[in-house]
Swiss-Prot record:
Residues 61-83 are annotated as: Disordered. This is U11-theraphotoxin-Hhn1k. Disulfide bonds join C75-C90, C82-C95, C89-C110. Expressed by the venom gland. It comes from the Eukaryota. GO terms for cellular component: extracellular region. It comes from Cyriopagopus hainanus. Its main location: secreted. Residues 1-21 form the signal peptide. GO terms for molecular function: sodium channel inhibitor activity; toxin activity. Probable ion channel inhibitor. Keywords: Disulfide bond, Ion channel impairing toxin, Knottin, Secreted, Signal, Toxin. Belongs to the neurotoxin 14 (magi-1) family. 01 (HNTX-16) subfamily.
C-alpha cells in the first residue's frame, strides 16, 4: 500500500511539473503567434493602404482628364442677344448695341469684330 502511495505521489509530481512546463511553453507559443498575427495584420493593413492610394490616384487622374476634356460653355453666334456685363459671344464676335435692326429691343447683340 505504501508503494502505491509513493508511486501515485511520484506520478502526480511528474504530471504537475511537466504540466507546468507545458503551460509556460504554451504561453510562449501563444505570445509568438500573437506577435506574428500582429505583423501579418500590419502587413495586410499596409497592402490595403497601398491599394487604396493607387485607386485614389486613378480616380483623381480620371477627374483631371474629365475636366480637361469637358465641353466648354456654348458661345453665342452672330445676331443673337447677349448680356453686356457677361458677353458669351464666340471668338471673333463682340457684344454691341444694335445699329438698325433690333433697336426697339433695347438689348445687345453679338456682331463680328
Amino acid at each position: 500500500m505504501n508503494t502505491v502511495r509513493v508511486t501515485f505521489l511520484l506520478v502526480f509530481v511528474l504530471a504537475v511539473s511537466l504540466g507546468q512546463a507545458d503551460k509556460d511553453e504554451n504561453r510562449m507559443e501563444m505570445q509568438e503567434k500573437t506577435e506574428q498575427g500582429k505583423s501579418y495584420l500590419d502587413f495586410a493593413e499596409n497592402l490595403l493602404l497601398q491599394k487604396l492610394e493607387e485607386l485614389e490616384a486613378k480616380l483623381l487622374e480620371e477627374d483631371s482628364e474629365e475636366s480637361r476634356n469637358s465641353r466648354q460653355k456654348r458661345c453665342i453666334g452672330e445676331g443673337v442677344p447677349c448680356d453686356e456685363n457677361d458677353p458669351r459671344c464666340c471668338s471673333g464676335f463682340v457684344c454691341l448695341k444694335p445699329t438698325l435692326h433690333g433697336i426697339w429691343y433695347k438689348s445687345y447683340y453679338c456682331y463680328k469684330k
